[in-house]
Amino acid sequence: MADQLSSGMGNLSIDQQPPSGPQMGGQGQMRRSYIPPHLRGKMGDAAPPMAGPNGLNNSAWAGNNNYDARGPGGGGNWPAPGGPPGPGFEGQQGAGWGGPRPQGGFNPNAYRGNAGAGAGAGAGGGGGSFSNRGSGDGQWRDGKHIPGPANPRVERELFGTPDDPSKQHTGINFEKYDDIPVEASGDNVPEPVLTFSNPPLDNHLISNIQLARYNVPTPVQKYSIPIVMGGRDLMACAQTGSGKTGGFLFPILSQSFHTGPSPIPASAAGAYGRQRKAYPTALILAPTRELVSQIYDEARKFAYRSWVRPCVVYGGADIGSQLRQIERGCDLLVATPGRLVDLIERGRISLCNIKYLVLDEADRMLDMGFEPQIRRIVEGEDMPKVNDRQTLMFSATFPRDIQILARDFLKDYIFLSVGRVGSTSENITQKVEYVEDIDKRSVLLDILHTHAGGLTLIFVETKRMADSLSDFLINQNFPATSIHGDRTQRERERALEMFRNGRCPILVATAVAARGLDIPNVTHVINYDLPTDIDDYVHRIGRTGRAGNTGIATAFFNRGNRGVVRELLELLKEANQEVPAFLETIARESSFGGGRGGRGGGRGGGRGRTQTADYRKFGGSGGGGFGGGFGGAPASGGYGGGGYGGGGPPAGGYGGGGGAGYGGGGGGGGYGGGGYGNPGGAGGQSWW
């Protein structure tokens, strides 16, 4: 190309030739330079002097020509002698291309992918080592945990500022949590802790808790911290918004900071010391993408500046980026069951080093049909057996079938029931309005005009209604967005982010956002469509009144919702809320054969004791059950009056006899003695 350029220059006329002279670096010799067509024939000022052969040594590429000409900021952006440095990250050792060159030759540790070596500074901008892990990395060196340096930018990202509306802070009723009753059953239950202190917690974790501006442990944290730190398994029920996530993250991270990483099997190391398969020591399973993302964000907060690297995997997102994240190191893994099974099948995750297994919202995972995947993960892969790991189950509700499932996953566990689980917080003011379907939109507009300000979460039953209602509100000049299962993960995350930061203070959602999501500072929850299950209602309104803050929950009720009227009445009375007269009237109508009977049958069954009590104490009790039936003549039965009872878990589970089966026939056992009964046939036959 240079020859072509030279030959081309030879064809230029003399008046187009550049002048010679010392200013061109040629000491009187002719140097030909290319002149653009629009400048040809014009005599201009001489070009600035360019020292060195070919005029390169004063450019940003000078170092490529002459190694010794480089300035002190080596690495990728080599500055010109006497010129400004390259655009590296100023002041950061090895964090960018402008960092200093490595001293003393090649450092093989800088290229390793483990948590200890190379977790500090990068290799002088050479790019071989991954940079600090974003949350500020510490190291595990010589059996000690060495926290990394503070990073103000990352701290603002993780913890926000005191007046940041997107971060949850404790509210005015937070101290009332001390009045919530707590029941712990099991052998040798440890005493609760009253403060975040050492012991039992690690000092570095306490500093991160202080950065998050958490001052006092919630009731579930007061009990779960000493239980988990003592090596015990735990099944915990807690009122929504009570700090369940901290209840398992605090003790797991504290113990990890003390004990350090588990050794990776010798066969696992790949080329250059970097393995493709991850060996996490803690696994947290949750049912939805939003919930695992939320838990991951909390884990990043409390693992800040530590050696522990949290990772998150879930379906509906690019698996390639998740694999790259895992390859960079994964000590604490938050996952949905389906995506985790996929990664295990790909050979990218091993569970052989798991010390802590957490099932969050376990009842919801079973409701969504994840039991086969959960059993495969826990029992069918290389996870240590129940006696070689700690297992924790957390949820807002624990129906009896979940408690029985715990026999397979937990050992000598402590059952913790905090507050009225399956009930609601008194921080939430519940209002039930009688609204026919055709009037719902106009009533909704009245409410939104009346309660302007704050974040409002509106729950509907169908995806189509979510989009339709959000479009209607936008046309009425209300800034709204929607979230449901048909939206892509990127769209869902964007909608949640706009809702959190207040750009769209109205969010219309289906049940996908109802369970476990911690959306800070929601002041009003509206059940535009009431759910058919009272537990779903509990979880929906639990999105407000969190961490001691107050909130309002409004429900649109009509005779189409009479299936939940009895349970709704009981719920309002438990939480000391106003009970409208029309609810009492419709409840009386339902009791005369119209609607579904109560699930309670007294306090013996239904949402009461069986949802919150330790079945090991009450496993043999019958009574109640789903009593009442769907209504109708005794011959057609309904749910039957036999009830949960039975002979304790080993003898037959849901127990039985008595009453009709699910829809017909008489007699019939429970789960253990003949199943639910066969509709239209003899009750002794089983569906199972």
UniProtKB/Swiss-Prot annotation:
Subcellular location: Cytoplasm
Motif Q motif in this chain: 194-222
Domain annotation Helicase ATP-binding: ranges: 225-416
Residues engaged in binding ATP: A238, Q239, T240, G241, S242, G243, K244, T245
Region (Disordered): 1-170, 590-615
Catalytic reactions of this protein: ATP + H2O = ADP + phosphate + H(+)
Keyword flag Zinc-finger: no
Ranges of compositional bias, category Gly residues: 88-102, 115-129, 592-608
Keyword Signal part of the UniProt annotation: no
Assigned keywords, A-Z: ATP-binding, Cytoplasm, Helicase, Hydrolase, Initiation factor, Nucleotide-binding, Protein biosynthesis, RNA-binding
Polar residues: compositionally biased ranges: 1-15, 55-67
Molecular-function annotations in GO: ATP binding; ATP hydrolysis activity; eukaryotic initiation factor 4G binding; G-quadruplex DNA binding; G-quadruplex RNA binding; mRNA binding; RNA helicase activity; RNA strand annealing activity
Motif (DEAD box): 360-363
Biased composition (Low complexity): 103-114
Disulphide bridges, residue numbers: none
Highest taxon, organism lineage: Eukaryota
Name of this protein: ATP-dependent RNA helicase ded1
Originating gene: drh-9
